[in-house]
């Protein structure tokens, strides 16, 4: 049986993550309150951020920026803003 969580991002009960994907207290908070679906949405945004801003995960400043954006996205509902990105128009 799948583990469920009250997802703060989706605002509803949904299937939870299978294991803690992020270290520390923040990782525990994500595991306890973020669903697989919400984590998948974050991963798409994270990929865009890394690519568009040319972030280097070996750089601590870049890692800090990504973590801040992750918290804003998952827990405060703020979308990731990428300068110059225009989403494709639906067909």
From Swiss-Prot:
Single GO MF descriptor: iron ion binding
Any one of the GO BP annotations: cellular response to oxidative stress
Entry-linked Pfam families: Iron_traffic
Keyword Metal-binding: no
GO cellular component, one term: cytosol
Family annotation (InterPro entries): Fe_traffick_prot_YggX, Fe_traffick_prot_YggX_sf
Source organism, top-level taxon: Bacteria
Known function: Could be a mediator in iron transactions between iron acquisition and iron-requiring processes, such as synthesis and/or repair of Fe-S clusters in biosynthetic enzymes.
Name listed for the protein in its UniProt record: Probable Fe(2+)-trafficking protein
Taxonomic classification: Bacteria, Pseudomonadati, Pseudomonadota, Gammaproteobacteria, Alteromonadales
